[in-house]
Regions:
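Hydrophobic transmembrane alpha-helices of multi-pass small-molecule transport proteins
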Residues: 129-147, 271-290
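Helix-helix packing/entry segments at the starts of transmembrane helices
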Residues: 103-109, 179-195, 230-262
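C-terminal transmembrane-helix exit sites in multi-pass transporters
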Residues: 91-96, 110-135, 254-274
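Membrane-interface helix-cap regions at the ends of transmembrane helices
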Residues: 2-7, 52-72, 139-152, 195-215, ...
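Transmembrane alpha-helices of multi-pass small-molecule transport proteins
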Residues: 12-13, 37-86, 167-172, 190-206
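Loop-to-transmembrane-helix transition segments
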Residues: 12-20, 60, 65-90, 156-165, ...
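Juxtamembrane C-cap of transmembrane helices in multi-pass membrane transport proteins
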Residues: 22-39, 44, 89-98, 106, ...
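Glycine-/small-residue-enriched transmembrane alpha-helix faces in small-molecule transporters
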Residues: 1-43, 151-178, 297-300
């Protein structure tokens, strides 16, 4: 018995995508709040992975479907889990140096990078309009960062960490689309937590900062949000195209900006807003183009 219907409608998959990206905003908010405590990034990531794996294991036990957590292609899942580990560490680092709004604007390069990866490795082709949209998107990143100005909303450590996040997430998204043909979404999420926790606790053997009950509670909530977001994301990717999922990535800008203002009273500057508009427009065009291609392919 499968834990989810074998076929989920596009609307249902989109609902899971929206839920997943929202839970990830809450995860990132928790990470940014925890980052103010000075905990090492690897220690935060270790507990993130541990709590995420625990929640998913309890989920499998409650449904009597522990077998869906087991990987079928261990080596491939291990590689994908390492990508998640690197992504999570860089998210922690980036959020210590950037506002939530600027962080999401920069990570919105991911759908554009996915389009480039698909053209190079999957030979999907890159029409000139799509190429122009990608160039416009990267121009938006330059505008948002505005290196020519002195008053910026981040620093180069945050920008570099975001670059690694984008690379890991983009490869992971394409890879996950392939893996979900044989693997359960729960298995991908669970194994990611295991790999992340194992690597994080191994690094903690060298140095671990002391924890308080409050910090443990915050990391517990962080792990819960991440588990829910990751599970929803993989369910969405399994039941609809990557293009459908990636275009809803941009809802994080709305929720992230709102949360950033409510908690830290951060207001995005003019260059950040202009860059965000360029990235948003180019990303939505790329996603819409990919969706049209997918629809035509299915119609044939």
């Amino acid at each position: 018995m499968r834990p989810f219907p074998a076929v989920l409608s596009d609307l249902g998959a989109i609902g899971f995508a929206l839920a997943g990206f929202t839970f990830w905003v809450l995860t990132d908010t928790s990470i940014k709040l925890l980052g103010q405590s000075g905990l090492p990034a690897y220690e935060m990531v270790a507990f993130l992975g541990m709590f995420m794996a625990i929640f998913l294991a309890l989920y499998g036990l409650a449904r009597g479907q522990v077998q869906v957590l087991l990987p079928k292609r261990l080596s491939l899942q291990l590689g994908r889990g390492c990508l998640d580990m690197a992504n999570n560490v860089c998210v922690v680092i980036a959020l210590r140096h950037l506002t939530l709004t600027l962080f999401y604007i920069l990570v919105f390069m991911a759908p554009l990078v996915i389009a480039l990866l698909s053209a190079v490795f999957l030979h999907e082709g890159l029409p000139w309009r799509k190429g122009a949209a990608i160039v416009a998107g990267f121009a938006g990143v330059v505008v948002a960062v505005h290196p020519w100005g002195s008053a910026r909303e981040g620093d180069w450590i945050g920008y570099a960490a975001c670059g690694v996040c984008v690379a890991c997430f983009s490869v992971n998204m394409v890879w996950s689309r392939v893996l979900t043909r044989t693997e359960y979404p729960e298995s991908l999420a669970f194994f990611s937590g295991i790999v992340t926790a194992a690597a994080g606790f191994a690094l903690m053997a060298g140095h671990a900062a002391p924890l308080t009950p409050l910090l443990l509670g915050e990391m517990f909530v962080m792990g819960l949000f991440c588990a829910l977001g990751t599970l929803c994301f993989y369910i969405a990717v399994k039941h609809t195209s990557a293009a459908n999922v990636s275009q809803y990535h941009y809802t994080q800008l709305i929720t992230g900006t709102l949360v950033s203002y409510l908690i830290w009273r951060n207001k995005p500057g003019l260059f950040v807003l202009l860059g965000g508009v360029l990235i948003l427009a180019s990303g939505l065009y790329v996603a819409a183009s990919a969706r049209e291609v997918a629809t035509l392919t299915e119609g044939n």
